[in-house]
Regions:
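Hydrophobic alpha-helical transmembrane signal-anchor segments
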Residues: 17-20
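Non-catalytic, solvent-exposed segments at the cell envelope interface
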Residues: 4-14, 25-227
Length: 227
């Protein structure tokens, strides 16, 4: 009987090349390391960007969540949405990441500049994997399989609740792009919820870059813990 699973090849053969992981220290200072200084006013919304190598081998914004600082509630932003990225020919939100990280993504969401009352958090691929080192429970609505021919890693995602090991995180993130919109949204919502909850206990050694001050981060982390 023919399998109904979707196969996704991740790696050199499909132009998805695992590039060097970005290692960065947590910067708890206003606008540090990403260009323009952030507003002195405490943000009411924080754009959290989780990065991972995309199909062209370049780090991209794979998961973008706009988080309410007061409640910790979040709304995912469509990473394939059309935006303006100054100085480039790229037009998808996810592609803003190489041109300034989470700050560039937040600016793209704001139509070219970061909206008033908005902060940002930049979670690199390595930092994301570290946050979810113990894996994550996700409900898989649609079965699919991935094979990373660079890392030589095969990942099998069955329908139902599944504990996804951190070694399969890249396969999950890249594979969901080929699923039906509803299936993709279900998986990304669960992944965002778990990732934000894990970030609530992040420490400076975990490689997260942010525009928030130390005091603002403390309050934000408390809100994230509600997820």
């Amino acid at each position: 009987m023919m399998s109904t699973k979707r196969w996704v090849l991740i790696g050199a053969a499909s132009a998805v090349v695992l590039v060097a992981l970005v290692v960065g220290a947590l910067v708890m200072s206003t606008g540090a390391g990403r260009g323009s200084a952030a507003s002195s006013a405490a943000p009411t919304t924080v754009v959290v960007v989780f990065a991972m190598a995309g199909e062209d081998g370049v780090q991209a914004a794979q998961l973008v969540a706009a988080v309410d600082v007061a409640t910790g509630a979040f709304e995912l932003r469509e990473t394939s949405a059309t935006v303006s990225i100054p100085g480039t020919s790229y037009s998808r939100l996810r592609d803003a990441y190489p041109f300034g990280g989470a700050q560039a993504v937040a600016a793209a969401l704001g139509g070219g500049s970061i909206a008033a009352g908005t902060g940002w958090v930049d979670v690199s691929q390595e930092a994301w994997q570290r946050l979810l080192a113990s894996g994550v429970d996700v409900t898989i609505p649609e079965a699919f399989q991935t094979f990373d021919d660079v890392a030589e890693r095969y990942s099998d995602f069955e329908v139902g609740v599944q504990h996804v090991a951190v070694e399969d995180l890249r396969g999950l993130v890249n594979g969901v792009a080929y699923l039906a919109p509803d299936s993709r949204q279900t998986i990304l919502n669960a992944l965002a919820k778990a990732s934000l909850r894990a970030m609530a206990s992040a420490t400076p050694s975990q490689g997260v870059l942010t525009s928030l001050t130390t005091e603002q981060w403390t309050g934000f982390a408390k809100a994230l813990a509600k997820n």
